[in-house]
Amino acid sequence: MWVSSMWWPVLFLCAAFGAVFGNEVTLPVSVKFGDGLLSFSKNTNGLFYTINEQDGLTVENSISTGESNVARNNQEYTLTECSTNEEACVEFIINDVNVILKKDLSNRASSVSHVVVNSSTDGVRIGACVELGDGVDWFGGPEAKYQLWPVQDAQWNYTAYYTKEDDAVAIAEPYWLSSQGTYLYVNPATSMFIDQNYLNEGSLCIYAENVTPYRERNYTSLEYWIGRYEDPRTAHEAAVEEFFAKPTDVPDERMIAQPVWSTWARYKIYVNDTIVRQYAQEILDNGFNHSQLEIDDFWETCYGSLTFNTSDEKFPDIKGLTDDLHDLGFRVTLWVHPFINVDCTEYYSIAESAGYFAKDVNGTILTTWWQGENASVIDFTNEAAVEWFTSRLTALQASAGIDSFKFDAGEASWAPEPAVLTGNVEESPSIYTYQFARALATFGNGIEVRTGWQTQDLAIFVRMLDKDTSWTFENGLPTLITTLLVMNLAGYGFVLPDMVGGNGYIDGVLVSTQYPSKELFIRWLQANTFMPSIQYSFVPWDYDNETVEICRTYTELHEAYAPTIIEAMNALVANGTPVNPPVWWLDPTNSEAYNISDEYLLGEVILVAPVVVEGAVTRDIFLPNGTWRDATYGTYDIYEGPTWIYDYPAPLEVLPYFVESSYWETLSAGSGAFLPSSSLTAIYTSAILALLIQLFN
């Protein structure tokens, strides 16, 4: 909570055009700012300044220095007009605090306000609070463990906004978007904290403060943009064009079309040559396709050695293993992390003596991670450290026959804090993630990372953080969809969903395993089917033949629609449009669409409505604007959106999905490869018969 000595100048920022100003002023004072009114006042608590406009968007700005002298009666203030024909502008100066407000007047159909507040005072905290508003839905913000959609009810208690393990904030782009067509974008170089619905109920507050995990800077700065457009889609497209880098290409197409098979959830750390061979053979014996088999934790001699344990109990002939897997048609990928544990003495000593570890301002290099209480992490902002790390990986690829890598961790929070990193101090600490992803992307578009900061341009998969094996919004199945939507809105459309069924952790213990139920496993795969890739670890044949048949069918359906997924990815490359947008993307002024958190789109041509509620065999489906063909049962009935379909039958075998009519006609006129296979039709026929039996009984 704020201490009583703090003062809070407040800015209510709304639309405004033009200005009339003086220079030195005595408070209170009001001046014209376009068609708005800019008012400054003071009291014993400090300085307040307000802009009011008709549409009512409210942003409260605050500057706290602890011991304030701003309210002294003899204080002089300078208010200066800096407008041009295309931009309204006002500058306000008091002591070392400089506030600049600008508004773009070049387009009457939209408006963009740009606010910069700077102060060189030590210990200053600058803030801005957006009133979320009754009846207004908000989207965006960070990846989170409790991932809501929309996000206005999320709670954040004055937390540093950077990539971190805590709360699963692996994506931390400073961007929010409202259903009213408003976006908020904060300069990512800000020493940023957020507070939502905690200190100020009903508000999203952003702050700049130079305290841990941020290094001390010469000044404190809060810079942000607020764009106002006719609807959220138009606003998002403008924000992407202005602030987000577009990918340069699409990721590996085989990873898109065919599943990744990982040893992690099923076997945890208990992997060896025998288990990997058995796993591969099971995949083939059950008729499943594959892009690659990923050997996860624990294959090293010690954590950080990047050297296979070649004991008889582990991997006595790793090259022989990978050669055999290649002969079976598998590519082989390897789990890699950026840590070296202290007890991995040979490699730890080399890295320590060469200065390859990230350190804090006191020179401390120790950190902890989930497989090491005493460890250090490679500094990916250090070019020599990157060269040492990546050259060892390249040598490992050649000697062990490894095709690509799954890179874990990479969030800035793994470095000792506040970290001393190479590069612009204003970009620290998240510059660690920026350099981590870029260094490892040099291994090609078949890699995966799990974190991102200003790295939307990379042609690689970004994996969701580990999901829990549950039906709840506590990191369970429903958050597979909401996380997908949040990542897409942040510009990361090449999403690798976490493993089908979750990770099976018991009470958060990494080496324990509780299998998902049959129902949860099947519903998870169905929800995943039209996402960019499928990742298995738990397997369908651990259940029964019905599960195998259902899962094989949806795995094949995913591959059949891989060209559509790639089309959507190419649209992201060209235009920055999401690969998997929210439903409102096609109906951006329809308030009913804003709260749909259990449906998603593939591009603009497929609507997916999976069942994510335990025990449910029907669901209500919202179809946005457009003409839709019901592809679920192969009947291709036509629906005109926007409309609701209530109590749509969706027994366990069924994933409801709809194809945009003109796209369906294109598919029908082609090879028909995207239409339901005979096995899928058989499953749906069986499902219909089962429903009829239930009805008549």
Could you describe each region identified by the protein language model?
Residues 21-111, 119:
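Beta-strand-rich N-terminal accessory domains
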